[in-house]
Curated annotation (Swiss-Prot):
This is Ribulose bisphosphate carboxylase. It is an enzyme of class 4 (lyase). Induction: Induced by growth in high levels of dissolved inorganic carbon and low NH(3) levels (at protein level). PANTHER family: RIBULOSE BISPHOSPHATE CARBOXYLASE, RIBULOSE BISPHOSPHATE CARBOXYLASE LARGE CHAIN. Mg(2+) binds at K191, D193, E194. It comes from Hydrogenovibrio crunogenus (strain DSM 25203 / XCL-2). Binds 1 Mg(2+) ion per subunit. Homodimer. The record marks K329 as: Transition state stabilizer. RuBisCO catalyzes two reactions: the carboxylation of D-ribulose 1,5-bisphosphate, the primary event in carbon dioxide fixation, as well as the oxidative fragmentation of the pentose substrate. Both reactions occur simultaneously and in competition at the same active site.
Length: 459
């Protein structure tokens, strides 16, 4: 059934929809299945994503039609369509009237993913009216809170050198805590790897007290504040809160230095919201494990990594992993820096829409996946700043001297870039950074050809 007469209006102007502040606008790449027209399928998507179905129903009235999602723009040559969703379509909390992210996802990227007349459909951007942003939680704390604890400048506190405890699984409590202590002697921030929690060989109630003690000892030895991101991911919110409460109680006076890591993609929006609303004083660390199933550049359905990051800011994530922008081991390229810009700035141009955040706190880009001291200068140069959290597991524990030396090499890498120094010349006066060349020779050969001769290192 062709529903374009009701669910499409190509005379609508985007600037008018934006000025009206009454719609969420969504941009998709779309390819119809063979034998179907582009506008026909686009209208069917809008219908299925709002008030329609595959037949006319007798219960539809004029009010219902007033909240139809409408296709307002198509670019068939480039396979792009845009839909305006009336804001009133989205479910609201009974408790506080906030708009539910799950409702947005259910409509904008729900049943339309399985329609028979659609070959491919992927959301690549969306726009939220500035006047409606207060209906989303947004972050409660951000990187400025961490900078304050670290004694940094409150507006431009710079790079936070972090790691992931490696190996990701298999360490018992004592070796785990020792690995944390060794890194903290040179670095700032440690996160649980996303599967770490309460395994039988490393029970939470044994390892967390040891990690809290390791933090205290490292702080005493270095005179620096240390940060820990503890995984509270679980199948239900009672278990999440049980873990969170135990962790905060165990860290005691150092509890403000604890972030909560949540596997937000596999766990879903409700898990992020549980952490955000129950623990607004803690840094909310959104890990996106599993997202590549739909956000991979090879995927043609679902939504992009850009969309996931933008959603995370609305949900209230203090920070989210954004890949490595082509400088690490994860999928992505240099243009992914726009993901970071969208979540850290108060306004930014996305692939389709210019989003103003109206003062909503920023979400910090968290960089991880194959990064080390040699790869970071190029990364910083591409991004244009170093106000990120970087968690380098192999880049720390793979350093030829020690995890502390690996952590120090990360810090030195940032200082090298910030000062505008040539990395090889900088290495001559910075031992830990220099030893990173020997620690990661394959990277050194690729990024800094001739480094052996220049640094006097021989095979």
């Amino acid at each position: 059934m062709d529903q374009s007469n009701r669910y499409a209006d190509l005379s609508l102007k985007e600037e008018d929809l934006i000025a009206g502040q009454n719609h969420i606008l969504v941009a998709y790449t779309m390819e119809p299945a063979a034998g179907y027209g582009y506008l026909e399928v686009a209208a069917h998507i809008a219908a299925e994503s709002s008030t329609g179905t595959n037949v006319e129903v007798c219960t539809t009235d004029d009010f219902t039609k007033g909240v139809d999602a409408i296709v307002y723009d198509i670019d068939e040559a480039n396979g792009i369509m845009k839909v305006a969703y009336p804001f009133d379509l989205f479910d609201r909390n009974g408790l506080d009237g906030k708009t539910m992210i799950v409702s947005f996802l259910t409509l904008a990227i729900g049943n339309n993913q399985g329609m028979g007349d659609v070959k491919n459909l992927q959301m690549f951007d969306f726009w939220v009216p500035e006047t409606k942003l207060h209906l989303f939680d947004g972050p409660a704390v951000d990187i400025t809170n961490m900078w304050k604890m670290l004694g940094r400048d409150k507006d431009n506190g710079g790079y936070i050198a972090g790691t992931i405890i490696k190996p990701k699984l298999g360490l018992r409590p004592e070796p785990f805590a020792d690995a944390a202590y060794q890194f903290w002697l040179g670095g700032d921030f440690i996160k649980n790897d996303e599967p770490q929690g309460n395994q039988t060989f490393c029970p939470m109630k044994k390892v967390i007290p040891l990690v809290a003690d390791a933090m205290k000892r490292a702080q005493d030895e270095t005179g620096e504040t240390k940060l820990f991101s503890a995984n509270i991911t679980a199948d239900d919110h009672h278990e999440m809160c049980y873990r969170a409460d135990y962790i905060l109680e165990t860290f005691g006076a150092d509890a403000p230095q604890v972030a909560f890591l949540v596997d937000g993609y596999v766990g879903g929006p409700g898990m992020i919201t549980t952490a955000r609303r129950n623990y607004p004083s803690q840094y909310l660390h959104y890990h996106r494990a599993g997202h590549g199933a739909i956000t991979s550049p090879s995927a043609k359905r679902g939504y992009t990594a850009f969309v996931l990051a933008k959603i995370s800011r609305l949900q209230g994530a203090s920070g989210i992993h954004v890949g490595t922008m082509g400088y690490g081991k994860m999928e992505g390229d240099a243009s992914d820096k726009n993901i970071a810009y969208m979540i850290e700035r108060d306004e930014c141009q996305g692939p389709a829409f210019y989003q103003k955040w109206n003062g909503m706190k920023p979400t910090t880009p968290i960089i991880s996946g194959g990064m080390n001291a040699l790869r970071l200068p190029g990364f910083f140069e591409n991004l244009g700043h170093g106000n990120v959290i970087n968690t380098s597991g192999g880049g720390s524990y793979g350093h030829i001297d020690s995890p502390a030396a690996g952590a120090t090499s990360l810090r030195q890498s940032y200082e090298c870039w910030k000062s505008g120094a040539d990395p090889i010349e900088f290495a001559k006066d910075h031992k830990e950074f220099a030893r990173a060349f020997e620690s990661f020779p394959a990277d050194a050969d690729k990024i800094y050809p001739g480094w052996r001769e220049k640094l006097g290192v021989h095979k």
